[in-house]
Amino acid sequence: VPGNFNWNLWQGQTPDVPYLEERSHYTFRWWYEYSGGQMTDWGAHHLDIAQWGINSLPVEITGSAKYPSVKNGFNVAVDFDASYRYANGVVMNVADNGRNGIMFTGEAGRIFVNRGVIQGKPVEDLKRDPLPREQWRAYSFDNLKRPPRAGKLDAIINHMGNFFDCVEARERPVSDIESQHRSVSTCHLGNIAMKTGRTVKWDPEAETFPGDAEAQRLMKRDQREGFETDTGVA
């Protein structure tokens, strides 16, 4: 263990295991003890945007995955596919392959978006009437004269700046705590469905799997003595 690294403290409530460099930064992401693999790593970014568009909550999730088989090695899903059905009827598919981003498909066309790109129809129509560049520059990281707050349709480049602006103005940031909770919860739901290997039913209001003891057990984990927290999960 590196001399300046408190391995016991770093493990927190997870099981105490011998130090292994791969279990710490950066690769802790590929161990279920500490993270949720690509589903929670990149998924939290993309599902956040996707659920802004869906404007509903998932009620049924189906998942399948392949897992590594190396002893004492990475244990998160490496090949995975999850399908979410939302309360409003929308279906969202999440997979480990394909372009890194979100594809919205509707009656009027398709739009691809990620954290730096938005393209497709009707987005291409904006080339004839583009968004003012000043709107995009306004929230750049180094703009100390950025507007005090963002409107609903303003482009937000500096999320940290938007957060501090909203703290000062007592307003809701473009990416608020509720949407973040729902985004990461949706990622975990996908992992739970993949672990069970079947379809699970989800009550988004009660935040439980009704009548599904197996899935419900995966909502929490055993907590190591000295690091217990009250999660509120039964």
Predicted regions and their residues:
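Core domains of carbohydrate- and sulfate-ester-processing enzymes
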Residues: 1-22, 121-124, 220-221
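Non-transmembrane alpha-helical segments in soluble domains
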Residues: 7, 11, 47, 51, ...
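Short, solvent-exposed loop/turn segments at the edges of secondary structure
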Residues: 5, 75-79, 97-99, 106-107, ...
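C-terminal helix-rich "cap/oligomerization" subdomain common to oxidoreductases
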Residues: 75, 165-234
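Acidic/polar loop patches that form or flank catalytic/metal-binding clefts of enzymes
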Residues: 18-21, 56-64, 91-94, 111-115, ...
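Rossmann-like dinucleotide-binding domain that binds NAD(P)(H)
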Residues: 8-88
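Active-site rim elements
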Residues: 32-40, 66-71, 143-153, 166-179
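NAD(P)-dinucleotide binding in Rossmann-like oxidoreductases
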Residues: 83-155
